[in-house]
Curated annotation (Swiss-Prot):
This is Somaliensene A/B synthase. Disulfide bonds: none annotated. It comes from Streptomyces somaliensis (strain ATCC 33201 / DSM 40738 / JCM 12659 / KCTC 9044 / NCTC 11332 / NRRL B-12077 / IP 733). GO terms for molecular function: lyase activity; transferase activity, transferring alkyl or aryl (other than methyl) groups. The chain crosses the membrane at residues 32-49, 56-72, 110-132, 153-171, 177-194, 222-241, 247-269. InterPro entries: Prenyltransferase_related, UbiA_prenyltransferase, UbiA_sf. It is found in: Cell membrane. Keywords: Cell membrane, Lyase, Magnesium, Membrane, Transmembrane, Transmembrane helix. It catalyses: (2E,6E,10E,14E)-geranylfarnesyl diphosphate = somaliensene A + diphosphate; (2E,6E,10E,14E)-geranylfarnesyl diphosphate = (-)-somaliensene B + diphosphate. It is a multi-pass membrane protein. It comes from the Bacteria.
Length: 299
């Protein structure tokens, strides 16, 4: 009996570990736009409200699980819809590499779509979990993902669903937190088309109406360059200046503004799939770095 119980326990743990590993394979390429920055904002809320260390640890752990499910729902739906494209462009993704079957991914998506809002309800952020699910359905099953405006709105409104939930896991959203959320929402909505520079040929082949295909690659690059060039002004005025003229705020202002200017130059001067992929990764890291800065600018 003891041996059977031990074997059962081992089987359960192996299954759990395998599911955690598979979920990581699905979400790892999106961690810089979801899991890492959102967890930073949870921690910023904890610092702002002066939570004791033990409560802070619980809030952060709760946030990590919430945003793991948050991005897992997106990546499961996204990779199921884009399977044929991924066979050509992204051979390491789980559905293409055989780490997960299509049927397994569909079952996982059903499970996540049930578990995610329930967990959101438990944490007191149900409205934001449901907003994210509505956006996901519109993006992957409602056609938003095939048009530049829908794609940008999905990313932009998704910032609201992400960051409002992150803060409310700890406390009600403050006016200062809303200032950050609104600023980043507008920024992401306007500039998210940088992701569509990476595979213009593939998007054209599948009939996707991305911004570079609708307005032209050159015009899109000029627009994005202008947006990133104006970035330092928005960063300073809306995110950094309200925190006061401390040296660490000035240093952060310079770093974030400098990275924004670097992106402005890259988007027009560094072209090609590999360069555009690198540019997009820098955008993701800029977003995470900005939200890491909220730890001491919103305290």
């Amino acid at each position: 009996m003891t041996t059977m119980t031990t074997n059962t326990r081992r089987t359960v743990w192996r299954t759990v570990w395998r599911e955690i590993h598979v979920s990581w394979l699905f979400i790892r390429s999106d961690r810089w736009t979801t899991l890492f920055p959102a967890t930073c904002f949870v921690l910023a809320a904890a610092v702002h409200t002066r939570l004791p260390p033990a409560e802070t640890a619980v809030a952060v752990a709760s946030g990590v699980l919430y945003f793991w499910l948050f991005v897992y729902e997106h990546t499961l739906a996204n990779q199921l819809v884009g399977l044929e494209e991924d066979r050509v462009n992204k051979p390491l993704r789980p559905l293409v590499s055989g780490r997960s079957s299509v049927r397994g991914a569909r079952l996982r998506l059903i499970a996540v779509r049930v578990a995610f809002p329930l967990y959101g309800w438990f944490l007191g952020v149900l409205e934001w979990a449901l907003l994210w699910q509505v956006l996901s359905l519109l993006q992957h099953e409602g056609g938003w993902g095939r048009h530049w405006l829908g794609r940008n709105l999905y990313a932009g409104i998704g910032v609201v669903a992400q960051l409002a939930a992150a803060w409310e896991i700890v406390a009600p959203v403050t006016p200062d937190a809303w200032r950050w959320i609104v600023t980043l929402t507008i920024t992401v909505t306007l500039l998210m088309s940088v992701q569509d520079l990476r595979d213009i040929t593939g998007d054209r082949a599948v009939g996707r109406s991305t911004m570079p295909l609708v307005f032209g690659e050159r015009n899109t690059r000029v627009f994005l360059c202008a947006g990133f060039a104006l970035g330092p002004l928005a960063i300073h005025h809306f995110l950094m200046a309200p925190a006061g003229p401390h040296w660490w705020i000035v240093a952060t202002d310079v770093v974030l503004g400098g990275l924004s200017l670097l992106l402005a130059f890259r988007v027009v001067l560094r072209r090609g799939q590999r360069s555009d992929q690198h540019t997009y990764r820098l955008v993701e890291q800029w977003y995470t770095l900005a939200l890491a800065a909220s730890l001491y600018t919103l305290r």
